[in-house]
A protein has these predicted regions:
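N-terminal lobe of the biotin/lipoate ligase/transferase fold
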Residues: 1-89
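Long, positively charged amphipathic alpha-helical accessory segments at protein N-termini or as interdomain linkers
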Residues: 65-70, 74-94, 104-246
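A generic fold-level signal
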Residues: 26-27, 53, 97, 122, ...
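Generic structural signal for residues in well-ordered beta-strands
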Residues: 4-5, 94-96
Length: 246
């Protein structure tokens, strides 16, 4: 898969930058990364804390026209697996926290904001906005559990090298997704899920109720299916439930 990589010293948001570009006319990806984002964001109204030049702040634009809108979360799975595969080269303990966060043990090293546009029953465009803590040593926001690759391994990692590795893995997993091999992606995603085994504490964000459950599976539309300790089952979409962290 051909890809074009654009480097910016500063931009408001790499997602915004790609959103303004026309869709590629062929089967290719466009990647833009910035040393600094003035308006980088995470899910909802969350802001992404990043020291200038220390981390990877990048977005990927693809046109997955073969993906039905009911199965679009497969693309989220593919993107998460690409980041995990790159990080696995440097450390163990990497897992995927539903829906799109990357964790090292109980600490967040990466997050993804995904934006899609639809044409009929299929996706026209998909933009992955990814923040990955690479060489930042200290964090000062009120985020509860950030960690960087430097915090884990004790040495700095060239950000462009890590980006190239992520793009290579993304090419692999994205090709599986659009090529009709999503079962392979789904099985790998489930095997890598954070808190995949055993009962853990969750909170229903609409009621405030806390309950113990284990992850049963994540469906291709992105719903988290939980099996509760009392034998009942529930399913949640984004922001309807949160993991209660120690």
């Amino acid at each position: 898969m051909q890809h074009k990589i654009i480097h910016l010293h500063q931009t408001a948001s790499t997602n915004d930058y790609l959103r303004a570009l026309p869709s590629p006319q062929d089967d290719s990806m466009t990647v833009v990364y910035a040393d600094w984002q003035t308006a980088g964001r995470g899910q909802g109204s969350n802001k992404w804390e990043s020291e200038a030049g220390k981390n990877l702040l990048f977005s990927i634009l693809v046109c997955p026209t073969s993906i039905d809108i009911t199965r679009q979360f497969v693309l989220s799975m593919a993107g998460a697996l690409a980041v995990k595969a790159a990080l696995d080269k440097y450390t163990d303990g990497i897992s995927l926290k539903w829906p799109t966060d990357i964790y090292w043990h109980d600490r967040k090293i990466s997050g993804t904001l995904i934006e899609t546009s639809v044409k009929g029953r299929t996706l026209a465009r998909c933009i992955y906005g990814i923040g990955l803590n690479v060489n930042q040593r200290e964090f000062h926001s009120d985020a509860p559990n950030p960690v960087s690759l430097y915090n884990i391994i004790g040495v700095e990692t060239p950000t462009e090298q890590l980006l190239d590795e992520i793009v290579q893995h993304f090419d692999h997993y994205y090709s599986l997704a659009v090529g009709g091999h999503s079962d392979h992606i789904v099985s790998q995603y489930h095997a890598a899920l954070y808190r995949r085994e055993g009962l853990h504490l969750y909170e229903d964000t609409s009621t405030g109720e806390q309950f113990s459950a284990r992850i049963d599976h994540v469906s291709v539309d992105g719903r988290l299916h939980l099996a509760l300790s009392d034998g009942t089952r529930r399913e949640y979409t984004l922001k309807e439930v949160r993991f209660v962290l120690d």
